[in-house]
A protein has these predicted regions:
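Extended, well-ordered alpha-helical scaffold segments
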Residues: 1-4, 55
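Short, acidic loop-to-helix structural element flanking the phosphoryl-transfer center
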Residues: 3-33, 72
């Protein structure tokens, strides 16, 4: 049953509305790295089927690195793999108040919390309600 469920998860993924267009607009203007705490097999299968995967400069999956968010080492691995030596140039965009934003804080980089549910989370450097607001913040930085 667990194997069937893992297979199902790996073959099904729902894109956030506007995510592909968002990444297409940013592609080439900055490096885009996906950092995931997900299971490697499931995430790789999803990304294999995903239309925006070619827009990513790198993919860092916790189960492949032996460390997961909010541990700052996963962010440091992502920065090193994409050649970012200046943390002031890095921004973590995420919607997890327990993994994404604490990982950014722990790694000493700016963060944008995508507050889909209007939770009012205050630990991030910036807060955005949607991808359009994320894009505005990124392009101003």
């Amino acid at each position: 049953l667990a194997l069937r469920y893992s297979h199902y998860l790996g073959t099904h993924a729902d894109l956030m509305p506007g995510a592909e267009a968002f990444l297409r607009r940013l592609h080439g203007q900055m490096k885009i790295v996906l950092v995931s705490n997900g299971d490697s097999v499931i995430q790789r299968n999803r990304l294999f089927r995903c239309v925006f995967t070619p827009l990513l400069d790198n993919i860092v999956i916790s189960s492949e690195k032996g460390v997961s968010k909010p541990d700052p080492r996963l962010i440091e691995i992502a920065l090193a793999e994409c050649g970012c030596t200046d943390k002031a140039e890095a921004v973590m965009v995420g919607d997890s108040a327990t993994a994404d934003i604490p990982a950014a804080v722990n790694a000493g980089i700016d963060s944008i919390f995508v507050d889909w549910k209007n939770m009012g989370y205050k630990q991030a450097t910036y807060t955005a309600k949607n991808l359009a607001e994320v894009e505005q913040i990124l392009l101003k930085s």
